[in-house]
Amino acid sequence: MTMRVTFLGTSGAVPTTQRNTSSIFVNRDGDYLLFDCGEGTQRQMMRYGTGFAIDHLFVTHLHGDHVLGIPGLLQTWDFNERERAIAIHTPAGTRGNIKQLIQANGTTPSFPVRINEVSAGDVVLDRSEYEIRAIETAHRCASVGYVLDEDDRKGKFDREKAEEEFGIPPGPKYSKLHRGEAVEHEGETIQPEAVVGPARPGRRFVYTGDTLPTESVIEASEDADLLVHDATFAEDRKERAKATAHSTAREAADVARQAGASTLALTHISTRYAASADELVDEARDAFDGEVVLAEDGMERRVEFPDADEY
């Protein structure tokens, strides 16, 4: 089961020659999900080969650098004769704004556009193996972040124990036991828990959008495998970050550290650091012992299982 995250736009409010405005594409085992859609997102999708087969767009807030790509993307789908519905998930109270944004294009899409208002704590998308929840963030307007949480996986099957202790040869009985079914072998009933370990956690991906550092994000990011956090400024601009309801790279790292995240990706990088964002990375690494990466447009990250070393 793959989970790949492609950064389509990693700049702050203004794009640069190297960074587009905010957008992240997630491929979760063939489910294609888009988080935010800044101006030019559809070109980034073409450039980095993600494809356009998304059915769900998750909006963190309505600032232009996160939504101005929506009309163009809808228009392209229309030109390509899309028929499937698209669901746009947006913070509570912003449905009308999304409608106005779409109508400003002067055309009505020929396919269904479903606008779903969400609040912190809502399960926005519920799938058989994962769910996406909205989480509380702190910005200058109605805003949410999103958490993709996978269900627990089956425990690890102990082949050595099955064969050596119970004498069960490799074959169909292994599959049954791993599915949680008891099997009969040489007159003995073998229960699955005898050879299958405890359930193993799935993966957790967190995207904050624009936010101050908050306790709600720390709680939602507990043991996250990948936390993508606002890191607009360096620490010497901390007051500016606070005034504009953003985070510094060190503050993002503090969130990751307190949450016990594995990897922190810094995004929403101010144009102030267009030449080099090394100080953001350095400050984050000073505060967080896990992996720190500076998100770049076109960067792809594979989100591994917490126990990937066991495979």
UniProtKB/Swiss-Prot annotation:
The active site is at D65. Keywords: Endonuclease, Hydrolase, Metal-binding, Nuclease, tRNA processing, Zinc. It catalyses: Endonucleolytic cleavage of RNA, removing extra 3' nucleotides from tRNA precursor, generating 3' termini of tRNAs. A 3'-hydroxy group is left at the tRNA terminus and a 5'-phosphoryl group is left at the trailer molecule. Its EC number is 3.1.26.11. Zn(2+) 2 binds at D65, H66, D210, H268. GO terms for molecular function: 3'-tRNA processing endoribonuclease activity; zinc ion binding. Its cofactor is Zn(2+). The keyword Hydrolase applies. InterPro entries: Metallo-B-lactamas (IPR001279), RibonucZ/Hydroxyglut_hydro (IPR036866), RNase_Z/BN (IPR013471). Zn(2+) 1 binds at H61, H63, H139, D210. Binds 2 Zn(2+) ions. Homodimer. Zinc phosphodiesterase, which displays some tRNA 3'-processing endonuclease activity. Probably involved in tRNA maturation, by removing a 3'-trailer from precursor tRNA. Belongs to the RNase Z family. This is Ribonuclease Z. It comes from Haloarcula marismortui (strain ATCC 43049 / DSM 3752 / JCM 8966 / VKM B-1809) (Halobacterium marismortui).
